[in-house]
Regions:
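Conserved pre-motif I regulatory segment
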Residues: 2-40
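Conserved helicase motor core of P-loop NTPases
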Residues: 3-6, 29-30, 37, 154-160, ...
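Conserved SAM-binding loop
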Residues: 18, 72, 267
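Short, conserved phosphate/pyrophosphate- and ester-handling motifs at nucleotide-, phospho-/glycolipid
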Residues: 22, 52, 76, 271, ...
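Short, solvent-exposed amphipathic alpha-helical segments in soluble enzyme
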Residues: 88, 282-286, 484-487
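C-terminal accessory regions
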Residues: 358, 373-487
Length: 487
């Protein structure tokens, strides 16, 4: 398909005339897609309300209509779900598509970079500002540098290419000053031919939004490096944003939970300490929770966990084998029904691991136990960002109300040594370590309540009702990080 035909097909999917910036971005995209250079890459940077989502949606619909293969990816499960809703086709986490498990070691599974068997495929990655490249998380996944691995994966395929979509005004990954995946210079360093464009003009449909009006003003402060005073948020004249006096917060949160539910309401705050205060206040004063943890509570995973999904895959495989043996043993049924029917979720469709930031709803609290100086519970959990997948797992309760992001190093060491005492009858150290790494209490999920979260945890998500708590601020506390956070 030539440039003009592809451009025409995309315009047909818009439903309204594109803005000049969208039209320019479209020109760049069709040049990128028709470039014969196998190492072409494109960056689509767009601020809030500039039509980035509608443009990417039109691109996806067009490519599917003309039978061009496309794969949608995002850094987190929540972001992938939003990308899927906006585009009308399935989206996956980057980790799920580019890594495969090499070995399971209890605390940290080892994931190698997968072979790219895709051909002639466009990989579209949304929320690319979240893609890190410092390897702060260790080397559990590939090289430990997500951007490196993503680029290596895509361009080892035959005639595959990459489109990175994101907002450079958002918070960069932890430990980085800017988002490397949105930097043309960074991508050129990989030997790639970079196409890039920026959307800055707020589209007409968004101009009546107070959220986007204020986000645009804050983004302009970032763009022009004009961070000399605290931003003045405008509330008057808009129906989608308002100032919330503290005295009204409890009633307002209760109304939100009633109108849109716990899953679609969030409080975004600046620190784990303040998130902890909000979570306790919401549970006690809004939801009337009296127990430490109850059915209906919303939780967030705060440390990657590989054990429980590996156990789930084993159980699924065992049940499927058992069902096959049962059918084969009944010769009449085997002849009448040669195919084993099962409602089991295929093991390859469940999450590879539970990631830091994943949310879960407590469906049932079935057992509590105090062991090794810590508190545990067995829970039935439902994961709204993974098609309401249900999983029974052991959870560590001590992290629920701690001010630390997860168990501290000293606490992790304490738990390890206490559990090790139960395996002293195993003489060989290697065998003993293997047994500990398979212990359900050593691998208990570390969780916090998910009614209030920090901005990094919320990034890439989408909620119907959002409460933003900036805390007490003075001019002396004004920093670029704060402005990015507020944006």
């Amino acid at each position: 398909m030539n440039i003009e035909e592809l451009k025409y097909q995309i315009l047909q999917q818009f439903g309204f005339p594109p803005t000049p910036e969208q039209a320019q971005a479209l020109d760049v995209f069709v040049q990128f897609m028709t470039d014969s250079n196998p190492h072409a890459v494109m960056i689509l940077r767009g601020s809030a309300g500039t039509g980035k989502t509608s443009l990417s949606g039109a691109i996806v619909r067009t490519l599917r209509a003309v039978r061009q293969k496309v794969m949608l990816l995002a850094p987190t499960g929540r972001a992938a779900k939003v990308f899927s809703l906006n585009s009308g086709m399935p989206a996956y986490t980057i980790h799920r598509r580019i890594y495969r498990e090499k070995a399971f070691a209890g605390v940290d599974g080892q994931f190698n970079l997968n072979d790219n068997l895709y051909t002639d495929t466009l990989f579209m990655v949304d929320e690319a500002s979240m893609i890190a490249n410092l390897g702060l998380g260790g080397t559990t996944f590939g090289s430990g540098c997500l951007l490196d691995d993503l680029i290596h994966f895509v361009y080892q395929g035959r005639n595959d290419r990459l489109l990175l979509i994101g907002d450079k005004a958002q918070l960069p990954p932890v430990g980085e000053e800017e988002s490397p995946a949105l930097s043309a210079a960074m991508l050129q360093g990989y030997g790639l031919s970079v196409y890039e464009c920026d959307l800055n003009e707020v589209v007409r449909q968004s101009q009546q939004s107070g959220i986007l009006f204020n986000a645009t003003r804050i983004r302009q402060m970032i763009t022009h490096d004009d961070i000399t005073q605290l931003p003045k948020i405008r509330f008057s004249g808009f129906s989608d944003i308002r100032e919330m006096p503290g005295a009204e917060l409890i009633e307002a949160l209760g109304d939100s939970y009633h109108q849109v539910g716990l899953v679609d309401t969030i409080v975004v705050t600046r620190s784990n300490k303040r998130a902890n205060i909000f979570n306790q206040g919401i549970r006690n004063m809004v939801l009337d929770r009296e127990e430490e943890l109850e059915s209906g509570d919303m939780l967030m995973i705060v440390k990657n966990n590989y054990y429980w999904m590996e156990e789930e895959r084993k159980k699924i495989k065992e049940r499927q084998l058992s069902e096959e043996r049962k059918v084969k043993s009944e010769k009449f049924n085997t002849l009448a029904n040669p195919t084993v029917q099962s409602n089991e979720v295929p093991s390859h469709e469940i999450p590879a691991f539970l990631a830091n930031g994943d949310r879960a709803k407590v469906m049932k609290v079935s057992r509590r136990i105090d062991l090794y100086g810590f508190h545990f519970a067995t829970l039935l959990l439902k994961f709204p960002d993974y098609d309401n997948y249900e999983l029974e797992a052991t959870v560590l309760l001590d992290t629920l109300t701690s001010e630390a992001p997860a168990l501290t190093h000293d606490q992790q060491e304490q738990l390890f040594h206490k559990i090790e005492e139960d395996y002293q009858d195993i003489p060989l150290k290697a065998d003993r370590m293997k047994a500990i790494r398979q212990d359900p209490y050593f691998n208990a999920l570390q969780v916090k309540f998910a009614y209030a979260v920090t901005c990094h945890k919320a990034q890439g998500g989408q909620w119907s009702h959002v409460y933003v708590d900036q805390g007490y601020m003075t001019d002396e506390m004004l920093t670029p990080d704060y402005i990015h956070w507020l944006y």
